[in-house]
Regions:
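Subtilisin-like serine protease catalytic core
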Residues: 1-58, 137-138, 148-149, 157-161, ...
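C-terminal subdomain of the subtilisin-like protease fold in secreted/lumenal serine endopeptidases
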Residues: 70-81, 104, 137-141, 204-272
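Aromatic- and histidine-enriched alpha-helix N-cap/loop-to-helix transition segments
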Residues: 17, 57, 188-192, 249-255
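Extracellular S/T/G-rich loop segment that most often corresponds to the catalytic His/Ser-adjacent loop
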Residues: 128-202, 206
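Extracytoplasmic/secreted envelope proteins and their assembly/folding machinery
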Residues: 19, 23-26, 63-66, 95-98, ...
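Active-site/binding-pocket entry motifs
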Residues: 31-32, 51-52, 83, 146-148, ...
Length: 272
């Protein structure tokens, strides 16, 4: 792509409120007794506006925004939710920029869609295997868990394609107009993982995005062997079934910030 401009100047989109909540989850100031505490309040948020007023963002804008973020030193990149429709030319744009992010050591975090679909059987984009010549090691797909540590019923899942679950139900965070609100959604779960990734990077800046992904996978609160109820689709109709948690995602668990820092410390000491 030869363009340098991306996105639009539309301030109030259908995703504006959610994106403010994501920023609050990641980096709201801690211990000031106002609203909520962010996970990594030393983070600097780079806001790149690609959302349209309604509907999905244009993939060209997304590719250019990733390029801008990587070129300006972003360590953690959060994308909009996965999508099923990636025309070949536009898919190659995204692949190229994700590879550049990988080379520069950035981790890219993507919320799964909430359509109760097994992503091992139906391909969603972006994903780690979308490039024919190599698997992307810095890309992480996240779905939402509830307060009891169970997967939200309508989240997508996949033993080989979904990386990790994270709290995404009834999350209190910053909102529009200097207010605070409780929200639910895959994007908030992805922001939680992004916050933990940012925390790791702040303590151990030499770790790469690929290493941080490995750390997050290894340090989960394990739910392996736990049977949970999960929404599915049968002949394109919603239904429900019982699964072992480890049959729903690669890590078999829920992100754990404390354990992630311990794992990062261990990996960092091995590098010396």
């Amino acid at each position: 792509i030869n363009d340098s401009n991306y996105g639009n100047n539309i301030l109030l989109t259908s995703d504006a409120a959610t994106n403010i909540m994501k920023a609050g989850i990641i980096a709201a100031k801690r211990d000031n007794k106002i609203g909520s505490d962010g996970i990594a309040d030393q983070a600097e948020i780079m806001t790149l506006r690609i959302c349209t007023r309604e509907g999905e963002p244009y993939l060209k804008d997304m590719a250019l925004a990733i390029h801008y973020a990587v070129s300006h030193g972003a360590d953690v990149i959060v994308l909009p939710e996965q999508n099923m429709l990636y025309p070949e030319e536009q898919k190659q744009w995204i692949i190229h920029e994700l590879k550049e992010a990988e080379k520069k050591g950035a981790i890219v975090i993507v919320p799964a869609w909430n359509t109760s679909i097994d992503m091992d059987k139906v391909e969603f984009f972006p994903n780690r295997k979308m490039s024919k010549d190599k698997e992307l090691t810095n890309l992480m797909i996240v779905a939402s868990s509830d307060k009891k540590g169970n997967p939200v019923m309508d989240t997508n899942y996949g033993a080989n394609t979904l990386d990790i679950y994270a709290p995404g139900t009834d999350i209190y965070s910053a909102y529009m107009g200097d207010t605070y609100r409780t929200g639910t959604g895959e994007g908030l779960a992805a922001a939680t993982v992004a916050g933990v990734a940012t925390l790791i990077k702040s303590y151990f800046p030499k770790l790469t995005g690929s290493q941080i992904r490995d750390i997050l996978l290894k340090s989960v609160t394990s739910r392996k062997g736990v049977e949970v109820e999960k929404g599915i689709r049968v002949d394109d109709r919603p239904s429900q079934d019982l699964f072992l948690f480890d049959d729903l995602c690669i890590s078999g668990g829920i992100v754990n910030a404390y354990q992630a820092i311990l794992e990062a410390e261990k990996m960092n000491s091995q590098k010396k």
